[in-house]
């Protein structure tokens, strides 16, 4: 749904419409969809008004005023800023309470903070997901072969840790945070959940309940 290259012909996709219909049927907690394309936004608003919508970080809005304009849009319940805005506290503090309530920070981005090809990277992923070839983009990161590493993400200038949330963001009035990595392996996702959602003194207990036992032999 956050594909940046959608065309009108893609709006009739059977699987995506079935998924939206399923989300819309839920009478309990309201479901939402992360969106890049305004074309898709208009289609979903018309056909699935039960859903709420989130402005995707794949828009790569690197101008703060542009980001603020996105936050002010009534179309979105939440807006995920480019992770390079995460620590620009002087600018973030200028937002009103209602605007702060709409900001959803991406906490654990691993991409280079200085990357200038982020938008092209997302477009390449969009082309691949549409089955197109020859995207013309190749990541030039020095540590590309390592893949995603949480330890590396923690060193990123835009990283938001638990202490940051508790001691900086919450006092400023920000309460929405998201974790990257749904497409990564379950072991990494477990580490995210342990770090962000489990008190340190209970993390080992959770690991033991899930997979650690005296028969596990890794080496």
What is each PLM-predicted segment?
Residues 1-66, 70, 76-219:
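Active-site pocket-lining/capping segments in soluble small-molecule metabolic enzymes
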